[in-house]
Amino acid sequence: MDDLRVIVGAATDAGAVREQNEDALYVADPMVDPVPDNGLLLALADGMGGYQRGEVASQLAIETLREVYYAEPVGPTDIPQRLKRAFRTANERIFAGGSAAGEENMMGTTLVAAAIRGVDLTVANLGDSRSYLVPAKRAT
């Protein structure tokens, strides 16, 4: 079997409507992350602009995802459940943070993540942010 080669690029933009960029990105560095055997974790959270603190929600989602995913080693069949637990924990923390600050400070975000371990890819998604798998021969 050929080795898997992953090339990652990441960028965000506030767009034409918003003044503030409410996106948060995470691209794991397997050489630095606490459990490198868990593979490569990639994530994007897009804070919801209709709320006051979308940028806080997106950053909290990314931080929680990283914390929960790398909390301990995972086996290849454990990755979907680990991502599910990370998403649920992020949701609970975001809801609690918004609720504690009062209704005028509610916050929300989308979250999409990909975990690559060996030649296996697991994608998790919450909200309307999308992920695309682009084969090397089709990338332009």
Could you describe each region identified by the protein language model?
Residues 1-140:
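PP2C/PPM-type serine/threonine phosphatase catalytic domain
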